[in-house]
Swiss-Prot record:
It is an enzyme of class 3 (hydrolase). Its main location: other. This is Acylcarnitine hydrolase. It is found in: Microsome; Endoplasmic reticulum. Detected in liver (at protein level). It comes from Mus musculus.
Amino acid sequence: MTRNQLHNWLNAGFFGLLLLLIHVQGQDSPEANPIRNTHTGQIQGSLIHVKDTKAGVHTFLGIPFAKPPVGPLRFAPPEAPEPWSGVRDGTAHPAMCLQNLDMLNEAGLPDMKMMLSSFPMSEDCLYLNIYTPAHAHEGSNLPVMVWIHGGALVIGMASMFDGSLLTVNEDLVVVTIQYRLGVLGFFSTGDQHARGNWGYLDQAAALRWVQQNIAHFGGNPDRVTIFGESAGGTSVSSHVVSPMSQGLFHGAIMESGVALLPDLISETSEMVSTTVAKLSGCEAMDSQALVRCLRGKSEAEILAINKVFKMIPAVVDGEFFPRHPKELLASEDFHPVPSIIGVNNDEFGWSIPVVMGSAQMIKGITRENLQAVLKDTAVQMMLPPECSDLLMEEYMGDTEDAQTLQIQFTEMMGDFMFVIPALQVAHFQRSHAPVYFYEFQHPPSYFKDVRPPHVKADHADEIPFVFASFFWGMKLDFTEEEELLSRRMMKYWANFARHGNPNSEGLPYWPVMDHDEQYLQLDIQPAVGRALKAGRLQFWTKTLPQKIQELKASQDKHREL
């Protein structure tokens, strides 16, 4: 697919979706206008007929699960939503949370920005969407899957992900939720005046809402699985370790994101709070005055501050995270739920370097400048610059060829950011509860004219296979083989949501990850693999820390002398 085709296809898909919605909403039958109760009032949804199936889906959009987090509730935990009288309209997508859409332009995705810009944006954004089979009713007790979107905790929205096909194909309830992003979601003063992690508290509030209400929509509150990708996977993993979220769900799926992702968790709020104070003109204040000053800023002023953050970390706040996730994972009283954890085989292949603005730098890597590039990279990884030699030895060896060096660099970054953290979390969890691990390996055919030919399964490539559609429910030109892979992946995910085990008759067997380190290679022909990246894991978790310790010891000795 060329960039031009992608542009035309995005537009056609978007307007096609609108026409479909308008057409179905126009039908005036009781079934076309479903009304359901919630603990705060009644909501009316729509009936959607899913193309190529005889089945219908009831959608309920923009349901509030918390009070608008504005005024005194900015930088405060979410509060229960206000009740309403009459029947609330649940046929329009909610406003997305405040975010910097210019990031998409900078990433060379103006079409995506154009589409997102057609949706309203507001600080009042704590809403969720529900997709449920049209036959479902109270007492249906269907499994529930709650999707948490990714986007580095700074960008994204619930409505980009259409749960209709997953709902229809697997006869379950899909919920997509929103949460505060960027500064509004994760600013912290590091004390009682603004502890932070507001976005995670929003997600927990949405999960509490699901517990209280999902039975009215045909869902089983005792069979809730949370799933998400990238920062959404990090969110899922964070709820698995947080004592505040215990009992709100029964299974977890982490796609290319866990609580140990290096850029999305921080011991201290200092760097973010200092930057925010400086940019907002609220400097030289104690934390109480800083929070008061920031609450007085307009949405436009907050957006301007958000622009400097391409990602933002959650913080060890003493409440949502009583200790660092690594300590929580290792603690005796850790009680995880059964989990699917996985990565793609080219996580840093294309889209992340483009979004982060490092694609040109990678293209310029040669043997001559490699040492300097690795020194800079080591510093960004918070490693001593002296570690650059070890990185070179492990990933590049004596290779002279520039393209090979560039590919090895992206493998190194993918391992550091995604693969190693995912394997570490899987190893912590598997001694307490079942873990099913996967590596997604299929490069989608519809991207072959958009991306460089060496890119394999890039970050987020598995999402359309799980939802059987691209953003906003747009149908993809899957090949027959891809159609089968998508059906299998939906079935694995749904089986797991239903029983805590992805396996069933007719599917290639997916073994639990035990001490034999088995995992599933998710490809056109799925196969069982063993000990994914065991050598790299050894390097990052044993060799490198040992080298850093030796360096520190010799520096300390040198200082004493």
